[in-house]
Amino acid sequence: PLKFPPSHDDKYDLIILDPPAFAKHRGALRNALKGYTRLNVKGFQRIRKGGILFTFSCSQVVSKEHFRQAVFTAAAQAGRKVRILHQLHQPADHPINIYHPEGEYLKGLVLYVE
């Protein structure tokens, strides 16, 4: 289970969620999306109003759309309004072959949490 370090009010201005790959094959997609949702709910519960949350996925079988949906579902479950400040993707040293779109596996969001 995800554990945050103790603090006086247990709320943070900045949280970075960068887990290992949750799915390495298509059969694990559903559980991976549940995992991303659970992880992000915990992040949204622990961030202060006006905080910034960085959240990432390196799971090849999780599309950008699936990842965004898991994060948006988490925000709704946590009762938080969020705005996307920036969408992140893999850098030029991780080129994507047009014949292998699954090679686009690094993805992230920078979110402002209201």
Indicate where each model-derived feature is located.
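Short charge-dense sequence patches
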Residues: P1, L17-R26, V61, I98
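S-adenosyl-L-methionine
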Residues: P1-I16
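Amphipathic, non-transmembrane alpha-helical secondary structure
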Residues: L2, P6, T37, V41-F44
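Short, well-ordered secondary-structure micro-motifs
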Residues: P5-D9, H25-A28, H66, N97
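C-terminal catalytic and target-recognition region of SAM-dependent MTase-like enzymes
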Residues: K11, I52-E114
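Mobile active-site "lid"/loop adjacent to the S-adenosyl-L-methionine
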Residues: Y12-K42
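Short amphipathic alpha-helical interaction segments
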Residues: N31-G35, Q45, S59, S63
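Helix-to-beta-strand junctions that scaffold the AdoMet/dcAdoMet cofactor pocket
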Residues: I47-K49
